[in-house]
Amino acid sequence: MTIIRKKHPLIKIINHAFIDLPAPSNISSWWNFGSLLGLCLIIQILTGLFLAMHYTSDTATAFSSVTHICRDVNYGWLIRYMHANGASMFFICLFLHVGRGIYYGSYNMIETWNMGIMLLFAVMATAFMGYVLPWGQMSFWGATVITNLLSAIPYIGTTLVEWIWGGFSVDKATLTRFFAFHFILPFIIVAMVLVHLLFLHETGSNNPSGLNSDADKIPFHPYYTIKDLLGALLLLMGLMILVLFFPDILGDPDNYTPANPLNTPPHIKPEWYFLFAYAILRSIPNKLGGVLALILSILVLALMPFLHTSKQQGLTFRPITQTMYWILVADLLILTWIGGQPVEYPFIMIGQVASIAYFTIIVILMPIAGMIENIILDLE
């Protein structure tokens, strides 16, 4: 068996990635989220595949087909809610994974980090298009509002929007192409994940101490395979509690009303995992400015390797930057809350302050804190 594992051209790749991989001996549970994201992706692709077997991407029948899945297909309700809530679990793991990367300075592995940012964009695009497919009120109006943002691009904006819509409004052509993209993107994401792993295995994993762990490595299997299995069980337990007891807690009631272009819902808002970005978008009065801020809210992560001023990698022994980090986390929670609130006083003001704070902490305060800590710890 050992010979096959180490010699076979295909199995050898799996062996080097998941079995004989030298891993740091001290990586904590924060390093579990990579494998959990892999599990989420598998769940989403499988449930999505079974949903696609019964779904019809036509404005006349899309809403009915989703109802049909929930009522008439064997365990269709289970598949549908696993897919919908699986997306939420996916984003929870994504945010924790990125948060871990920021906390422990993993962004210094630039190729892996940039690939991760591209993955984040791809997953967000996929989730957005998936939300349009049930063709409820929030699906339709969410698609209308978000695609309409592209009209802010000078000169080509309006043409671009009509090209994406396939007409002069969100209609049958839009739904069909969104279904096509929503189906193909996860497979592109799988390919990107493999590249992400390829880059990671060039450098090896970071660890909580932020020190080089070459002198103290252990094999990935059995130590981390069993640890990942425990994480997977906890994730599945959380997902199934959500699916079986509170399937609609994260959804919008408006999406149980079929799409109606003549009736605008009082509060148009995306799924909870986009609310922080939506709040940043809304906090800028200018349309193009809002769109740029929206893109920058994620793209600012790409600047982190260049804003790293500290002589230490992680925040483990850096109390000032640690404080900044947790203020940033609180700020993101505030933005998420604001994104779901109506556009009125005092929410507008809170959103603007929180948006400014978000960029200020990342671009200005954390690098300054790093420099101060170098001086305090006499590392200059």
Curated annotation (Swiss-Prot):
User: Quaternary form?
Assistant: The cytochrome bc1 complex contains 11 subunits: 3 respiratory subunits (MT-CYB, CYC1 and UQCRFS1), 2 core proteins (UQCRC1 and UQCRC2) and 6 low-molecular weight proteins (UQCRH/QCR6, UQCRB/QCR7, UQCRQ/QCR8, UQCR10/QCR9, UQCR11/QCR10 and a cleavage product of UQCRFS1). This cytochrome bc1 complex then forms a dimer.
Molecular function terms from GO: metal ion binding; ubiquinol-cytochrome-c reductase activity
Chain ranges passing through the membrane: 33-53, 77-98, 113-133, 178-198, 226-246, 288-308, 320-340, 347-367
Report the function annotation for this chain: Component of the ubiquinol-cytochrome c reductase complex (complex III or cytochrome b-c1 complex) that is part of the mitochondrial respiratory chain. The b-c1 complex mediates electron transfer from ubiquinol to cytochrome c. Contributes to the generation of a proton gradient across the mitochondrial membrane that is then used for ATP synthesis.
Species source reads Phenacomys intermedius
Where heme b b562 binds, per the record, is at 83, 182
Q: Does the keyword Mitochondrion apply?
A: yes
Protein's name in the database: Cytochrome b
Q: Which cofactor does it need?
A: heme b
* Residue sites binding heme b b566 per the record: 97, 196
- Please provide an example of a Pfam family that matches this protein in its UniProt record: Cytochrome_B
- Family to which the UniProt record says this protein belongs: Belongs to the cytochrome b family.
Cofactor binding summary note:
Binds 2 heme b groups non-covalently.
Q: Does the keyword Mitochondrion apply?
A: yes
Q: What other comment is given for this protein?
A: Heme 1 (or BL or b562) is low-potential and absorbs at about 562 nm, and heme 2 (or BH or b566) is high-potential and absorbs at about 566 nm.
